[in-house]
Amino acid sequence: MKITDKNIAIFKKWYIKDCTVRNKDFFHFSVRNIKESRKASVIDENTVTKGEVGIYLDGSPDDCISLQPLKNMGQLYIGSASYNSYDEVVCVDDEGYVYSRSCKYDSREKKIPFGIDGPLRNIITKIKNISGRLYIVGYNNSVGYRDGVNDWQSLCLNLPVFDYSKEKGRFGDEFKLRDIDGFSYDDLYVVGGKGYVWHFSGAEWEQINFPSNIYLETVCCAGDGYVYISGQSGILFKGRGNKWEKVSAGGYSLPFEDIVWHAGKVWCTSDYGLWCLDGDTLIPVDLPSEIAVAVGHLSVGDGVMLMAGMYGAAWHDGQEWHLLFNSVEWQSDDEAED
């Protein structure tokens, strides 16, 4: 199905913050209102309207896109997984407020439980599908997973807790988890802080002896059996357990937002570009100009990779790229109207 300018005109008022693959024909995005974002201060985040947008490649021209505006939510993350034979899309904000929808429901949910035992001990920084289950990770060693509607289970277990009341003058950077991935439910990795890496083997967490104290941002448990971890400036490590090697010295302006495994390769992206690991060499991907606008975030599932930036999105089928939309020109027109 051809997505027309009329279909995607909705993105004139919104820009993308995150994306997820529901299946090879359904792509979903967390978005935020552009005009409200320009006016809001840092402490007014919840006054900016957020939203969940779905694009359906198998739909008719009149029924290929949906929008659900969401009020009173903070920084919004989005993921998708299957439960009880139907798939769902789940949006969580940094404070643990939840919106979810599937073919059976479409509603706001109870806030994710907060407390020393988790799942939430502080703010959320990521939601990710691992082996068909949605996991969340965040500050103060927050880790948990979704077990159904209004059902979040803690995986904080033996992860240490930072006591802000007793540690005045410190921010507990080493407890600020940024990402999670895994080969299975019983083989998970979380990363964050300065060289802070933990491994879960099914019973408890074990801290990994990581060979660097740089700030860590992303992790990918890849199809080649290795774990890839990136940090500040795009520095990239490869390993597993307590054996690690640096495969890229970085030197980029921004850290990677996401690392994924797709089409037999490791892919990394930031707002400044897309890179692919060729052997042990990280090389920039030469993208057509209309696709390059979509760099920023990655999601994989059902054999495809979705890439989304503030003003565009594209997907890769394992062989070639397909543009979903590019709204950069619309944004220029909109700014002129302001």
Where are these regions (language model features)?
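Residue-level hotspots at or immediately adjacent to binding/recognition sites across diverse folds
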Residues: 1-338
